[in-house]
């Protein structure tokens, strides 16, 4: 079932932070693999940015076998995503998942607008030094599943579905394959 609107009007406190996800962490089950405290906060829009996929430092992701999501400034464009309220105890695991220590991504602060028009400040990530590359079919599927699960605007979901993946036909990690299989059986 799709989420809608902000679920928690209190926002972050000294024990928590808000994280704007636009890639594989759109999907609840995916973010909970490493960050169990993540709780849906709301759907939001990042104005004047565009979604892209790439290989950090020209190296293909060994996890996803294709380009992975990033954002870049692009006046007039927008990126939709999910804001998660997370316990600060998950900061290190989130940074680790995003490859901050290896220099794959940098932490950025973004101002996003909720569907109700409220502006909130969130933590997010931006890939540095990357070459554009299409995502694997599995990575694209996880992103599309998350967009649908959380009720991102239908027009944006269609844009995500229209992304051309690479031709990787192998497997990704077992835990991700399990999530994809569950998603496919739920839509039958």
Swiss-Prot record:
InterPro entries in the record: G-Glutamylcylcotransferase (IPR017939), GGCT-like (IPR013024), GGCT-like_sf (IPR036568)
Known catalytic reactions: an alpha-(gamma-L-glutamyl)-L-amino acid = 5-oxo-L-proline + an L-alpha-amino acid
Molecular function in Gene Ontology: gamma-glutamylcyclotransferase activity; protein homodimerization activity
Record keyword Phosphoprotein present: yes
EC number, as in UniProt: 4.3.2.9
EC main group: lyase
Residues that bear Phosphoserine: 173
Binding site for substrate: 19-24, 139
SUPFAM superfamilies, A to Z: Gamma-glutamyl cyclotransferase-like
Family (UniProt): Belongs to the gamma-glutamylcyclotransferase family.
Record protein name field: Gamma-glutamylcyclotransferase
Naturally occurring in which organism (per UniProt): Homo sapiens
Lineage, broadest ranks: Eukaryota, Metazoa, Chordata, Craniata, Vertebrata
């Amino acid at each position: 079932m799709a989420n809608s609107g902000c679920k928690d009007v209190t926002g972050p406190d000294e024990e928590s932070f808000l994280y704007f996800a636009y890639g594989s962490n759109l999907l609840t089950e995916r973010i909970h693999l490493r960050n169990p405290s993540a709780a849906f906060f709301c759907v939001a829009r990042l104005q004047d940015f565009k979604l892209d996929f790439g290989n950090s430092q020209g190296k293909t992701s060994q996890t996803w076998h294709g380009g992975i999501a990033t954002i870049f400034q692009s006046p007039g464009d927008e990126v939709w995503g999910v804001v998660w309220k997370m316990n600060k105890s998950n900061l290190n695991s989130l940074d680790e998942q995003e490859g901050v220590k290896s220099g794959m991504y940098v932490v950025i602060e973004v101002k996003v607008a909720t569907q109700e028009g409220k502006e909130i400040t969130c933590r997010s990530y931006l890939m540095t030094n990357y070459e554009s590359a299409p995502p694997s079919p599995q990575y694209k599927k996880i992103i599309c599943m998350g967009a649908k699960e959380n009720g991102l605007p239908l027009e944006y979901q269609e844009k995500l579905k229209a992304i051309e993946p690479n031709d990787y036909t192998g497997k990704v990690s077992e835990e991700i394959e399990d999530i994809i299989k569950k998603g496919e059986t739920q839509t039958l």
